Every structure is written in C-alpha cells, then in structure tokens.
Amino acid sequence: MAELQTGKPTPLGASFDGQGVNFALFSADAERVELCIFDERQQEQRLELTARSGDIWHGYLPAAQPGLRYGFRVDGPFEPSQGLRFNPHKLLLDPCARQLDGWVVDDDCLQGGIDQRDERDSADIMAKCVVTAEDYDWQDDQHPHTLWHQTVIYEAHVRGLTQLHPDIPEDIRGSYAALGHPVMIDYLTSLGVTALELLPVQQHADEPRLQQLGLRNYWGYNVLLPFAVDNSLAAGDDALNEFRDAVKALHRAGIEVILDVVFNHSAELDVEGPTLCQRGIDNRSYYWLGENGEYHNWTGCGNVLRLNHPAVIDWVMDCLRFWREVCHVDGFRFDLATVLGRTPDFTAAAPLLSAMKNDSRLQGCKLIAEPWDIGHGGYQLGQFPTPFAEWSDRYRDDMRRFWLHGDISLGAFARRFAASSDIFQQHDRLPFASINKLTAHDGFTLRDLVSFNHKHNDANGEGNRDGTDSNFSNNHGTEGLEADDDILQRRLASQKALLTTLILSQGTPMLLAGDELGHSQQGNNNAYCQDNELTWLHWENANSALREFVAGLIQLRRTIPALQQETWWQEGDGAVQWLNREGQPLTPQQWEQGEHQLQILLSGRWLVLFNASLHAGEFMLPEGHWQVSPPFDETNPPEGGIWHGQAQAVCVLIKQTA
C-alpha cells in the first residue's frame, strides 16, 4: 500500500524528481482531496492529500515513476446556486497534467449533476492523467528569433497539412513526426514562410454532440488539458517528444513555431456538460458565474474561464512557460483573446495581459490576439497592449470587398494596405501589430472564396445553420468548383490579386495552408468537425503554378525595403507614394469616390499596379524605365510608359537603374 508524504505546494501538477512524484492541486473551496492512482488492471487506490498550504493541496509519493496513471476526487459542498459543484463520485483530471491516457467518451456517467449530485462513479470510464518525465536532449536548438517585420506566418493543422502528402512515409502521415520530416521542412523553406502557426495541439476532447453524430473536433479548440500534447496527432506513443522533435527540426530550418492556444473556455461546456476537471475542483475560482451560479457564455462554448482570478492567472502563466521552456515554442496565438482581458469588462491593463507582457520567461515570444469574443464589449480590435499583434478581420473583409465586390474606397484599401494605421498606430504600437489575413481555418479557403457565394456546411450535421453568412465571396457567375474556362481564369486572377495584396501589404502577412495550392473544402466555411479528405490538403492535385507564384511574392516582399522596415510609412520618407492611373497623386475625391485603379510606388523603385475595375484600363507610369518583376507574367510588359491592365488584374514593375 502506497503512502503519501507531505510534499510541497509547488509546482502544481505531478512532478517527478527522480525518486518519486510530488502532487499539488489548487482548490480554495474544497473540504477533502484524494489522489487516485491506478495500476495496470485499472484497480484504484485512494490517498488523501492531508497537507494544505493556503489553497494548495499536496503530497509526495515515494518511488512513484513516470507512467503512473492518476486522477483526483475532490469533496465539498454541492450548492449550484452558490457556484459550488463538488462531487467525490467523479474522477477528475489534473488541470496541469502533461499526458492523458484514454479518451473522454460520451457517457451520462460523466455528468456531475445539475441541481443535485449524480452519484454514479465515473472512474471506470474516465480517462486518466499520466506522470511524465520532461528530460530531453535539445542539442544545440536555438529560437530563430525572426524579427516581426520580417515574419511571414503559415497557419496549418498538423494532420491537414501532412496526412495526404505522398512523399512522407505512410506510417507517420498526419502527425508531429510528419511535420518534422525533411519533405515538409523543405516545402516550407522553399515557400519562404518564416513561422508555422499550428491549430491547437493541446489535448482536446470531442464534444458529446459530435460523438453522437460520428464526428470529431478536428480543429481541437475544445481543450481539455492545456499542458498536454494532444495524443491524437502523434504517430507513436510519446507525443511530447515527437512534438519536440518536430520543433527542433523546424528550428534548424529557421522556422518558428507558434501555437494556437485556448484559455477562454474548457471542454466541460455548459451546466449539462461533463464534470471532468475544473468544475469539480473549484468551480467558483475557475469560471465566470452569474449571481445564481449560472455559467456566463461569452465564448459560445458554454463556459468562460475566469482569467482575472490570481490562481487561474498563475495556471495560465505556468502553462505558457511550459510550452516555451519545455517545448521551445516561439509564440502563441490566443483564441477569443478578449476573455484574457475581462475583469469582467475588457481592459488592456488586465492582470493576465500584464503578466504576459512583463514575464521575463516569455521575453521574445510572439504574442498574437484574436481580439474578440461574443460577450458585451467583446470586439476589441486595436486595443491590446504592446507587444501583442492582432488578427485583423478589418483587413480580411475590406480586401475581400475591394477585389470581389468593388464597394470599398481606395482610401479604405490604402489604410488596410498600410498596416491599418488608423487602428494600430496608437499606444506606441508598430505595423507588425496588424496580422493581415484573407482566410484562416475558420471560413472559406481562398479557392472557395472565389467559387462559392454561399456556405455549404451540411456535412457538419447542423442543417447548414453553422458558419458565417458574411463572407464577401464571389463565385464569378457559377456556384461551385466546376465552371467554364472563362470563369476559372477570372477566379484565378482574383486569387492572384488577393494574394499579391496580402503579401505586399505592410504589416504581418498570414497565409492559410493550402491557399497557395488551390485547396478547396467544397464550400464548407466551418469545417471544425471534418477530420477527413475535405480538410486535408491534396498534394497530388495541387496547383503548382500558384504555389510558385506565392513563393515568388514572398521573395519579392523580402527585396522591397519599404516592406522590411519596422516603422510606419510617413509622408515624404520615400517608402510609399500613392498614385492614380495617370501616375499623379490621388485627389481627395479619388480617394473616396469609387475609384478602383491605383499605383503604389514602394521605396521609389517597385510599382504595384492594381486594377480592381471590371474593365481593362491604361496606366500612365511614373518617369523611368520599367520592367515586369517576377513572379508576374512578362507577356504583358509596359509599352511607351503605359501598362495595359486587364480587368481585376495586378502587376509589379521594377524601375531599372543605370
């Protein structure tokens, strides 16, 4: 029979010291905490944590080793109207656990009770935590530390990126091992991206509703254990080290790794959801609750983590440090990041945001906010503090509207092209703060954006009610991928115009994986539950010419000084000149009155020509000898100081020097 010693209150979670394992769990309102350990026959032994330091319950188990499976039972009042939902009949996961054994299944036995305790024991069907050892040989690994103004982000899903790649060994496709395979590294470096932003790799659970439909949470935003590397994306049985191998391989190629992390809600969902972890450990501390103990739902996922509580702030900060120090990641993208600044109203001076900003162990990390949630005052674009960058939906929507609908002025276009200075040039923020994107995992792919006017999400099992209807897409005359050659050519021209705009805008460009390959999701703009060939990239059918075009754009971006400077463009600094199609400065009327033709002179030498009109037009070029710059088509060179721009066309010219 194992016996617990007193142990210590830090660090939280299960910590192996070479001789045994220390366990520490936060709970302010609990009256009794039991550590539950399980042998290979699933036999449970309960050990009471009698030592308590403040609100931390702790104990030390001598001779315990990595691989030990465990959980907790936490007892205390069950008073839902007071926010108290303790239930010792439910085996609970350690919120700081580094590994999960098993999977959270759809079973009513996991329900802790709505108005009264559910007394069915959940241990037999509940997944278990696993003690891990974190030693690893990083060799000479170094963070690439790519400067923000030199960063090009590539957003991808581990499985979606690698599952169908024919040159990756079949037994590792769709995994972290595939991500670090030389074939994938070579592809990313040849494309020219500098940072790989991964959809969640934190251990997640599939919602009961999806399990009932035979679907999975493909994206992974239903996070269960934020400290644990998701087992479902590992080729082998050691997800942590497999992930670290991939990070090390990417770093050797100079590619940063940014993780999409979820701290706004948990996998316990609403009051009818399962009791898996925080709800049973300390419901009042971990969640935002109403006056009668009801869950606030500013996330749309049933609950909201209370990120202004000191203990919850410490938990998040410990988690970020784990991924930074143990896994060597280079940055984080925070899902529904307004929640991080709620007190409950949003403030840029919120304690968690301040902790991230000032933590010495996170210095050099790239921090990216998705600056909204669905609560009151949830839209906070431009309001996050330095050093955060932010996903810009204004950039996405305005650029889509300019090219695909023609209802955005040149003034609005120019503001987005210039890193949305009207939004971000405040509070000492720099142009990199605008994460410019046309598409992302949620929404249409670029090919679908020019092929569908309406979403087609029936496969999600929600009657096509899910996903946004505000897409600003344009199918160019026919709904769906199949169309005549004229429509297909116009769609390709629109894709190239949008991609050129994205890559050559000031700010930080983010490219959705597959957009450079012509990937389609058949019009599904909310493919969160499609873990299949709908979302996986089809490498063998890829548009290689489009990929080469995008790689050329990224290379071109690197050669233009105006796009490599850290500071804002200023009038007269030589970085940018805005010209009409006659080659003259735009008049106030032209800025705001329906013009769709524009010349942008960058660094005095690169001339970006935009004809977003539905009609061809002549552009009078500034003085000098101009030639078409790669990767643009040299079959339409300027003649006699004039460029003949086709409808919905874009081109970059370079001024020849003597």
Curated annotation (Swiss-Prot):
* UniProt site (Transition state stabilizer): 442
Compositionally biased residues, Basic and acidic residues: 457-468
Q: Which reaction does it catalyse?
A: Hydrolysis of (1->6)-alpha-D-glucosidic linkages to branches with degrees of polymerization of three or four glucose residues in limit dextrin
Keyword set includes Kinase:
no
User: What is its pathway?
Assistant: Glycan degradation; glycogen degradation
Work out whether the entry's keyword set contains Manganese: no
EC main class here is hydrolase
One Pfam family this sequence matches: GlgX_C
- Give the keywords, sorted: Carbohydrate metabolism, Glycogen metabolism, Glycosidase, Hydrolase
One annotated GO molecular function: hydrolase activity, hydrolyzing O-glycosyl compounds
Which GO BP terms, alphabetically? glycogen catabolic process
PANTHER family, per this entry? Answer: GLYCOGEN DEBRANCHING ENZYME (PTHR43002)
UniProt protein name: Glycogen debranching enzyme
Q: Which organism is it from?
A: Pectobacterium carotovorum subsp. carotovorum (strain PC1)
| Phylogenetic lineage | Bacteria, Pseudomonadati, Pseudomonadota, Gammaproteobacteria, Enterobacterales
From the UniProt record, report the name of the gene that encodes this protein.
glgX
